[in-house]
């Protein structure tokens, strides 16, 4: 599944994305974010992070720099003290 998702994202970047003007409000772009998230965390967790990112990518969100979190950042987020 991981390999298929990476191929799909790369296809989107090469064949579909150039047909439309740039609209992503974030850096890195949502497709680059998804590619990195899936490569780093695997298909399930990477897809979850990508979906969260895509839900934020809309005209009412200010956007900006939003990198893929490190694995240590993910652990801190789930800590309950």
UniProtKB/Swiss-Prot annotation:
Q: Which cellular compartments is it found in?
A: Cell membrane
| InterPro entries named in the record | Membr_insert_effic_factor_YidD
* A matching Pfam family: YidD
Topology versus the membrane: Peripheral membrane protein
What family does the Swiss-Prot or TrEMBL record give for this protein?
Belongs to the UPF0161 family.
Q: What does this protein do?
A: Could be involved in insertion of integral membrane proteins into the membrane.
Q: Indicate what this protein is called per its UniProt record.
A: Putative membrane protein insertion efficiency factor 1
> Which organism is this protein's natural source?
Bacillus licheniformis (strain ATCC 14580 / DSM 13 / JCM 2505 / CCUG 7422 / NBRC 12200 / NCIMB 9375 / NCTC 10341 / NRRL NRS-1264 / Gibson 46)
């Amino acid at each position: 599944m991981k390999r298929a998702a990476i191929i799909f994202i790369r296809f989107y970047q090469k064949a579909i994305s150039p047909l439309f003007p740039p609209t992503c409000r974030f850096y890195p772009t949502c497709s680059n974010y998804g590619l990195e998230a899936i490569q780093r965390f695997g298909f399930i967790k990477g897809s979850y992070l990508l979906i969260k990112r895509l839900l934020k990518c809309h005209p009412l969100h200010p956007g900006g720099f939003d990198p893929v979190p490190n694995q240590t950042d993910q652990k801190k987020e789930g800590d309950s003290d």
